């Protein structure tokens, strides 16, 4: 299977995950996300946020993968998700565009 296909599967896996169990096994130890607020957060921090009672994920759907570029053991992808979630009881419907970096470690592509 090509690296592009493997990264597409990671994107689809994240989009279709119904809980936070997808992220930790599919991310590097040094994974870092930067939220729209500008605050960085680790994979563990994201899992804790999604497992809190304040945040309730209702649905997530991959709308489009815009681009995947691979440079050796590093890649990036840009994709859009249609997400519905509630935060502290307030429902949000977001069309969110993500830019993600991936690393190829020990024969496996992971979110970085």
Residue ranges of model-derived segments:
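A solvent-exposed, acidic/Ser-Thr-rich amphipathic alpha-helical stretch
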Residues: 4-9, 20-70
């Amino acid at each position: 299977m090509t690296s592009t296909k493997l990264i597409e599967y990671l994107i689809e896996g994240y989009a279709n995950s119904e809980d936070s169990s997808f992220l930790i096994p599919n991310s590097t130890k040094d994974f870092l996300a930067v939220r729209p607020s500008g605050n960085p957060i680790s994979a563990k921090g994201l899992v804790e946020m999604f497992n809190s009672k304040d945040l309730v994920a209702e649905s997530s759907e991959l709308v489009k993968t815009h681009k995947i570029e691979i440079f050796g053991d590093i890649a990036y992808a840009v994709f859009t998700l249609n997400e519905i979630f509630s935060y502290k009881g307030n429902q949000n419907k977001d069309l969110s565009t993500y830019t993600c970096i991936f690393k190829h470690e020990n024969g496996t592509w992971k979110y970085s």
